[in-house]
């Protein structure tokens, strides 16, 4: 299948701690490492692992962090096409506590691709599946030339401005920044996630139901990236022709596997796991 992501990537500095320090407190890291993150980068990595690579249209700063981000993504089998900005690549600090829960502080503005950027937008035409995490309205319209288009509700203003039909939109009932409110035209599928409780879904033709969270393949290590991996799995399932329930089940498996691995991509499902 031909798969792609249009969106953002960030460079993350991770610290594993016993607990998140209270205001004014100090906590010593048990372990520290760095790597790519952000919804677009995590989803592109998951799609590349499930399929035969992934096209990623994004934006990076003209800096060492941008170079490191590109190299890390390409090492995971992703074909990266990035507009280069004078602004710095966004970074973030992420603490992971003993329960595997993550706390994030972002540093700098999110960089995302624009339709006027000299990127291979024509390669989205007829793609089996595209996941959209960030960009302008015209970038989303270019993504709509794909056979299947899924988007995150975190960029609801862009989705509303573009006014294109989405095959699916994923929102969160736990994160106010990702709460879905109706847009026109109505997406074919609206998914509202509830973390470890699974979530709900409804279609434009009136069908609705719940899906269950999948059991992780091991202890929960790190929830960073679980939601992005879920959305990538859903995109993959819809792109290969799964019905709603089966696509959501695959997404749930991807999210659970990611939570059982180190960092956002260490535990992600691969094609051999399907």
Regions found by a protein language model. Give the residues of each.
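Ligand-binding loop in jelly-roll beta-barrel domains
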Residues: 89
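Glycine-rich phosphate/adenosyl-contacting loop at the front of the ribokinase-like
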Residues: 1-57
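Ribokinase/PfkB-type carbohydrate-kinase core domain
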Residues: 1-9, 70-84, 92-209
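A glycine-rich beta-to-alpha transition motif near the start of alpha/beta enzyme domains, typified by
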Residues: 18, 53-81
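Conserved phosphate-binding/catalytic region of the ribokinase-like
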Residues: 181-274
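Short active-site-proximal "capping" loops at secondary-structure junctions
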Residues: 10-12, 61-65, 265
